Amino acid sequence: MARVKRGVTSHAKHKKVLKAAKGYYGRRKNTIRIAKQAVEKGLQYAYRDRKNKKRTFRALWIQRLNAAVREHGLTYSRFINALAQSGIEVDRKALSELAIHEPAAFAAVVAKAKSALPKAA
């Protein structure tokens, strides 16, 4: 039986790693051992930040909503409470987009939510 040498497979693996390390700085782009470590670390960052992206965007929407709602004399927390009481089920992403691109429609939503709040004595 013929002897199997692993030159072809190892070359393919190296090529795959170097392709993934394209654009890296210094020896990270052309030295196999260092490139492999850099690519693995990059994949770890990518995995972690795919999770963090959801948190980051939610925080952004909340900041935008807080700023937009304060123009109408409410705070973010009171606005969200008012939305729940009035039965309006629109997510924060849609509300922030509405506040940016359709201020009149957002003002109507705020007015509807305000009407659900109990009057302060």
Swiss-Prot record:
Signal peptide: none
Stated role: Binds directly to 23S ribosomal RNA and is necessary for the in vitro assembly process of the 50S ribosomal subunit. It is not involved in the protein synthesizing functions of that subunit.
InterPro entries attached to this UniProt entry: Ribosomal_bL20, RIBOSOMAL_L20_CS, Ribosomal_protein_bL20_C
Gene Ontology cellular-component terms listed: ribonucleoprotein complex; ribosome
Disulfide bonds: none
Gene name as annotated: rplT
PROSITE patterns per UniProt: RIBOSOMAL_L20
Annotated protein name in UniProt: Large ribosomal subunit protein bL20
One GO term (biological process): translation
Superkingdom classification of source: Bacteria
Keyword Flavoprotein carried by entry: no
Gene Ontology terms, MF aspect: rRNA binding; structural constituent of ribosome
RNA-binding in keyword set: yes
Entry-linked SUPFAM superfamilies: Ribosomal protein L20
Coiled-coil segments: none
Family membership noted in the UniProt record: Belongs to the bacterial ribosomal protein bL20 family.
Pfam families with a match to the protein in the record: Ribosomal_L20
Alphabetical keyword list: Ribonucleoprotein, Ribosomal protein, RNA-binding, rRNA-binding
Gene3D superfamilies xrefs: 6.10.160.10, Ribosomal protein L20
